[in-house]
């Protein structure tokens, strides 16, 4: 589900670049040095279960992105999203309510991955890795805790698995 787009600094792919520690934020960069990238959520339907990976942009981001993201994240991401792009509206068009989501899996808590989280808090389970939840407690310019405050996120314990793509896996069901 494409929930809109964002402008990303070309430094995102190389945060250790000579451009400085925070060059990836895109602040004070011209649009010429930024890339227009899609913001997506992935719906997986398997064995009668509805699983959503990430949430993309929300309805609130379409209505008032500066307020929703805060000034720094707004300027660093410059979201483009309409109400119909939001994950909640797209799921609704497919006949899926938040309560019909068996799981929402958050890969990480950057704003473009969790903006739509509050629209989906009726999901049966919302997961993120234990490590990501621990990192979210630290100061991080890429995170806006208001996007997940009041939403219960369950920690996933990742286990060593030599067959898994990154050497770890977890069984949710």
PLM regions with names:
Residues 1, 51, 105, 127, ...:
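Hydrophobic/aromatic beta-strand patches that form the interior of the parallel beta-sheet core
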Residues 1-96, 100, 129-173:
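Metallo-beta-lactamase
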Residues 39-41, 48-50, 104-106, 123, ...:
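Extracellular structured ligand-interaction cores
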Residues 44, 53-54, 101, 108, ...:
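Divalent metal-coordination and catalytic microenvironments
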Residues 56-58, 110, 132:
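Catalytic metal-binding/acid-base residues of hydrolase active sites
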Residues 61, 114-115, 136:
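Glycine/Thr-rich phosphate-binding loops of Rossmann-like dinucleotide-binding domains
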Residues 66-128:
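Active-site metal-binding motif and surrounding structural segment of the metallo-beta-lactamase
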């Amino acid at each position: 589900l494409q929930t809109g787009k964002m402008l990303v600094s070309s430094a995102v792919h190389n945060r250790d670049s000579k451009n400085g520690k925070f060059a990836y934020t895109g602040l004070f960069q011209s649009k010429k040095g930024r890339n227009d990238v899609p913001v997506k959520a992935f719906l997986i339907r398997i064995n009668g279960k509805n699983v959503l990976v990430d949430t993309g942009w929300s309805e609130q981001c379409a209505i008032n992105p500066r307020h929703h993201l805060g000034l720094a994240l707004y300027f660093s991401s410059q979201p483009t999203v309409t109400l119909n792009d939001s994950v909640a509206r797209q799921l609704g068009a497919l006949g899926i309510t938040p309560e019909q989501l068996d799981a929402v899996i958050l890969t990480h808590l950057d704003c473009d991955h969790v903006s739509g989280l509050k629209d989906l808090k009726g999901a049966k389970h919302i997961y993120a890795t234990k490590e990501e939840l621990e990192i979210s407690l630290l100061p991080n310019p890429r995170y806006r805790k208001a996007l997940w405050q009041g939403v219960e996120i369950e920690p996933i314990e990742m286990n060593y698995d030599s067959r898994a793509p990154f050497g770890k896996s977890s069984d949710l069901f």
